[in-house]
Regions:
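Hydrophobic alpha-helical segments within and immediately flanking transmembrane helices
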Residues: 22-23, 40-49, 63-75, 323-327
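Membrane-embedded helical hairpins/re-entrant loop segments and their flanking transmembrane helices
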Residues: 2, 6-8, 19-56, 231-318
Length: 491
């Protein structure tokens, strides 16, 4: 660090803080937890994880992609404290995976499954935040829209609509071409407009805004008051078998999202040497273990904040550390200011985040890439929505493997006809799994023809494959079929 980089890191840290603040608050709210939990998660990610991370630019904190897992896990385990115990275990698992150098296995996860996972997270996030944006009361779930057990809040809808409009405007050339505005994050403006609507609306139309839910951050008069707000893990939860399923799910999905973010960030701003994925998993493991102890949300490296950090000119970790310090200061001494922010504004930010994860362009691109990409992609989405994150990812990977095996079998051998001559080209080593395809091709050879086998690219034939070829070779003379370059001996 020197004065030259500091001049770039300080404003970068401020911008990252402004982007992270509404996301930290919104993700906590979407998880059904107090907003302070989101700020605490951002502080741990910004200060602790950054200190151990090998990346100079990756920003860690609460991730929108884990919201659905957090909500489902708390519901499964019954209490937030039991979830925190699972989070401690998840952090330990991440640390062990880092020690075992498991980061390199990220390359084994198919791209179609990863994209499907992110799209499913986006869809679930949208489904979860629609009731909040509409000012849900009554059922409070999306299903309440169809059952009739749902009442709307006009003030919430107006605030959420204004937030979505601002977020859209901030992506248009009109705003991007205004340099002064292009540096201000759209989510921050959306939240500020919501806060101003609350402040001035209370004076002008108090009845209209009476039903507008807002953030409720506690005030901390002392460190003891802060400590009283922190919730610790329930160590008795070790008796619950579901805790270990949740811990493994959190560890795998958080690690996957972190390493994907790191790969994407390296394309935006290459580092030399390339940050070690194993060291990153160690850092994330430390952060998530501490988050579980202190009562925070799961932590991952997040591409949105990381890309902002790079785009505004960050040169070192100082910008990320500064954003963590600012989140801490904001949570400790400016809670009154944050308490004017309506939940509908945060819902707008999260709805837009969900849309970006599951944009229609992504579906169109996957369809254009063909069934081999689209089928595992859509299977992953359906699996995650219907059965949960781990089951959905497992289904997606299994579908990709089966489809790859199918295509490999189709491409392993080809039969070409030249008048009464047939050429059977074997393109790769064959196993017993290729027998049905081989038998079908051999059955296409008519009587009184010539069959030539091109097996120059084959080093190994399974004994079962040889048995099929030998059986055909012994019957061929009786059908008037002449064999050329036959790969097995016949009587």
């Amino acid at each position: 660090m020197n004065m030259k980089t500091l001049r770039q890191d300080l404003p970068a840290g401020l911008v990252v803080f402004l982007v992270a603040l509404p996301l930290c608050l919104g993700i906590a709210q979407a998880s059904g937890l107090p907003p302070f939990v989101g700020l605490l998660t951002g502080v741990i990610g910004g200060l602790v994880v950054t200190s151990f991370s090998p990346s100079r630019f990756a920003v860690s904190g609460p991730a929108a992609g884990l919201v659905t897992i957090v909500v489902a896990s708390i519901e499964t385990l019954g209490t937030f404290s039991a979830f925190l115990f699972a989070l401690v275990l998840a952090g330990i698992i991440q640390f062990i995976l880092g020690m075992l150098r498991a980061g390199r296995f990220i390359a084994l996860v198919p791209g179609s499954v990863i994209k499907g996972m992110l799209a499913a997270i986006g869809i679930l996030l949208i489904m979860q935040q629609i009731p909040v944006a509409l000012g849900a009361s009554g059922d409070g779930e999306l299903s309440g829209l169809f059952s009739g057990d749902f009442r709307f809040s006009t003030s919430s809808m107006l605030v959420a609509g204004a937030g979505l409009l601002i977020l859209w405007l901030w992506t248009t050339p009109v705003i991007k071409n205004i340099k002064a505005l292009s540096w201000i994050p759209g989510p921050l403006i959306a939240v500020l407009i919501g806060g101003l609507a609350t402040v001035f609306g209370e004076r002008l139309q108090p009845d209209f805004l009476a039903s507008l839910p807002r953030i409720t951050l506690p005030e901390f008069g002392s460190l003891s008051a802060l400590a009283a707000e922190l919730e610790g893990p329930d160590w008795q939860a070790w008796r619950n078998p579901s805790v270990y399923v949740v811990a493994i799910t959190l560890a795998l999905v958080a690690s996957l999202e972190t390493l994907l973010s790191q790969e994407a960030l390296n394309k935006l701003r290459p580092q030399n040497p390339h940050p070690s994925p194993n060291r990153e998993m160690l850092a994330q493991g430390i952060g998530n273990t501490l988050a579980g102890f202190l009562g925070a949300l799961p932590i991952t490296a997040v591409i949105v904040r990381s890309s902002v950090n790079v785009s505004v000119g960050a040169q070192s970790k100082v910008s990320i550390l500064l954003h963590g310090v600012l989140l801490l200061i904001c949570g400790l001494w400016f809670s009154d200011l944050l308490n004017v922010i309506p939940l509908a504004s945060l819902a707008a930010v999260l709805l837009y985040t969900g849309y970006k994860l599951a944009t229609p362009r992504l579906f169109i691109d996957q369809i254009r890439m063909g069934a081999q990409q689209f089928v595992p992609f859509i299977t992953t989405i359906i699996g995650i929505i219907a059965f949960g994150m781990l089951a959905g990812i497992g289904l997606g990977i299994a579908t990709q493997i089966l489809y790859s095996i199918y295509k490999s079998h189709r491409n392993a051998m080809h039969l070409t006809r030249y008048d009464d001559h047939y050429v059977l080209r074997l393109q790769q080593n064959l196993t017993f799994m290729h027998n049905p395809r081989l038998q079908n091709l051999l059955d296409e050879i008519p009587e009184n023809s010539v069959l030539i086998v091109d097996h120059d690219n084959v080093d190994y034939l399974d004994p079962d494959v040889k048995a099929v070829l030998k059986d055909f070779g012994e019957k061929a003379p009786r059908r008037g079929i002449r064999l050329n370059q036959w790969p097995v001996a016949v009587k």
